[in-house]
Amino acid sequence: MANFSTNQFKAGLKIMLDGEPCNILENELVKPGKGQAFSRVKIRKLVSGKVLEKTFKSGETVEGADVMEVELAYLYADGEFWHFMNNETFEQIGAEEKALGETVKWLVEGDICTITLWNGTPITVTAANFVEIDITETDPGLKGDTAGTGGKPATLATGAVVRVPLFVQIGEKVRIDTRSGEYVSRATKAQ
């Protein structure tokens, strides 16, 4: 794999650090009044998910990580693995729960997810930024009941619980932002 110099560091770059692929979250070039310039880098280890800060001397090189990001459709979960399929080649890949993390709350069959592969093994699964999920359980919103915060908890078909407006009812499809876990709107009906 290619090597990257510290002057090529930018957010989103994937590098190898201590034998583990990492994603650069932030990069700051520091030029002290005395001495050599250095880069202060915030890194997330892709396998363990740990976030750490590391400094590199100016001009230092680091090996690039041989990771691949692919878009696959979620099929089903069998208890041990979550299965995804490439819609063009129909090749299937199973991901362990540790690769999914919080994403498991937003997986709906057929949705496209971004999967990061390292040596052919899924290490992270990211759901689309917005997903549409059915509401399976919520309290009825009573007319004129606006004394509270104007929201109520609702359980989605995936098991996740989000706050929704009072007018949303059981059986409706809602649009959720997976990055924040918040209600965005009712899902638009296909004509």
Curated annotation (Swiss-Prot):
UniProt subcellular location: Cytoplasm
Modifications the protein undergoes after translation, according to the UniProt entry: May be beta-lysylated on the epsilon-amino group of Lys-34 by the combined action of EpmA and EpmB, and then hydroxylated on the C5 position of the same residue by EpmC (if this protein is present). Lysylation is critical for the stimulatory effect of EF-P on peptide-bond formation. The lysylation moiety may extend toward the peptidyltransferase center and stabilize the terminal 3-CCA end of the tRNA. Hydroxylation of the C5 position on Lys-34 may allow additional potential stabilizing hydrogen-bond interactions with the P-tRNA.
Chief localisation class: cytoplasm
Annotated source species: Colwellia psychrerythraea (strain 34H / ATCC BAA-681) (Vibrio psychroerythus)
InterPro entries per UniProt: Elong-fact-P_C (IPR015365), NA-bd_OB-fold (IPR012340), Rib_uL2_dom2 (IPR014722), Transl_elong_fac_P/YeiP (IPR020599), Transl_elong_KOW-like (IPR013185), Transl_elong_P/YeiP_cen (IPR001059), Transl_elong_P/YeiP_CS (IPR013852), Transl_elongation_fac_P (IPR011768)
Gene3D superfamilies xref list: 2.30.30.30, Nucleic acid-binding proteins
CDD domains: S1_EF-P_repeat_1, S1_EF-P_repeat_2
Molecular-function GO term, any one: translation elongation factor activity
Keyword flag Protein biosynthesis: yes
Protein family (similarity comment): Belongs to the elongation factor P family.
Any single GO BP term: peptide biosynthetic process
Keywords from the UniProt entry: Cytoplasm, Elongation factor, Hydroxylation, Protein biosynthesis
Function summary: Involved in peptide bond synthesis. Alleviates ribosome stalling that occurs when 3 or more consecutive Pro residues or the sequence PPG is present in a protein, possibly by augmenting the peptidyl transferase activity of the ribosome. Modification of Lys-34 is required for alleviation.
Listed SUPFAM superfamilies: Nucleic acid-binding proteins (SSF50249), Translation proteins SH3-like domain (SSF50104)
SMART domains reported in the protein's UniProt record: EFP, Elong-fact-P_C
Keyword Cytoplasm: yes
Protein name: Elongation factor P
GO cellular component: a single term: cytoplasm
